[in-house]
């Protein structure tokens, strides 16, 4: 094992220990074994860069259909949208969820198409720096199903877009209102998620969520678009293949280029509460981080050493 790999391993161990005992006193997070909301899908939020920001058409006044693959099934959902990194309010005129027929095309099963409401309204405005969670919605789906979340955006202009830049899944954008269309011809196909934070489902007592937090390794670097080949995806498949673990959902919180003390997006030490501790239903956590803290040549590592 060369020195760089050894340092990465040691740093990962230190990171795990430090996160487990951050602050002046150790924190013990108690989780209750009872029915409640559990995260069946999620992504780690960050700012969309120029290459990940849609143009011609942009999101303003247009339709965006995004796909997700859930880890456990359910019959009730809550959808959380994020404008955490935005600097202006984002207006969304409508949100719908449906079963996706094929990960490579925007066609949905129209018989499953369901409106997602916020405080009883179809329209929602997400203030800058905030997240919103939908009403409880009746919607039935099975573990490992592919779902489509379709949004029709309003007249917000400019501003920073909150996204997960490396979705490794197709997102389809078309001009105008295609919110309830069974399918449409996209004018732009991106591979980022926009304003889409998490999907929760109601689970019975004994349900658990495991969070996978890390950098590009966790985020599926170099994996095939629409193949859902992150290690967290494979973990979800294996958990569902065993009757004893079908009650465990998987929440992926990797960010390519992320680091313990910096890197791309919010540093792992600063997002741990948001992306692990506060994830609905969390019981377990896999931490794989540290290589980017020592991998960038010529950078000052004084903070890392400290």
Task: List where the protein language model places each region.
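C-terminal motif of bacterial Sec signal peptides marking the signal peptidase cleavage site
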Residues: 17-21
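Low-complexity, intrinsically disordered short peptide segments enriched in small/polar/basic residues
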Residues: 10-11, 26, 283
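Bacterial N-terminal signal peptides that target proteins for export
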Residues: 1-10
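N-terminal secretory targeting modules
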Residues: 24-213, 223-225, 244
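Conserved SGNH/GDSL esterase-like catalytic core that processes O-acyl groups on lipids
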Residues: 63-66, 89, 97-104, 175-192, ...
